Amino acid sequence: GAAFLQKPNWQPDTRLWAPDINYINGKYVLYYTLGHWDLPKNSCIGVAVSDSPVGPFTDHGKLLDYNSGTMQCIDPCYFEDNGKKYLFWGSYNSTSKGYEGGIRYVELSADGLSIKGAVSEKIAGPSIEGIMVHKRGNYYYLFGSTGSCCEEERSTYRVVVGRSKNIEGPYVGKNGT
């Protein structure tokens, strides 16, 4: 079924995509993108809550937008570490369209519904999106997609991974770059 009974309308001329649902403090919290493929300044990340993972979700509005440190406010990824909650996001840059991409993160409030800290500097990118963060042992792993997508057999889209001893990076591959 649909996550929302009615699509959030606080950001006009956008589409809904890239959901990330997490169980936080007894509630299901949905982070989602409202964006426009050709208008990165319109991209935002919203947050919604439900008692059930299948919804319906109650929208709590905008969490991040292009004024939050990046014009590519898409592809949210929730991560919790040592009792702290974080949201990672970001995507490609496009100098031809006048914006810089990359991956950033911010610390969230205890309930995950608002921003607690300052937005990080770019920790990965500029050509990576759809990331997922995982911790194993003493390392943080950042998985993401890179390459050209949506070109059928000519697509070079693939998954890459980098690791770091710190959540803020740098995330490097096995060759150290």
Predicted regions and their residues:
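Carbohydrate-active catalytic/glycan-binding domains of CAZyme proteins
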Residues: 1-177
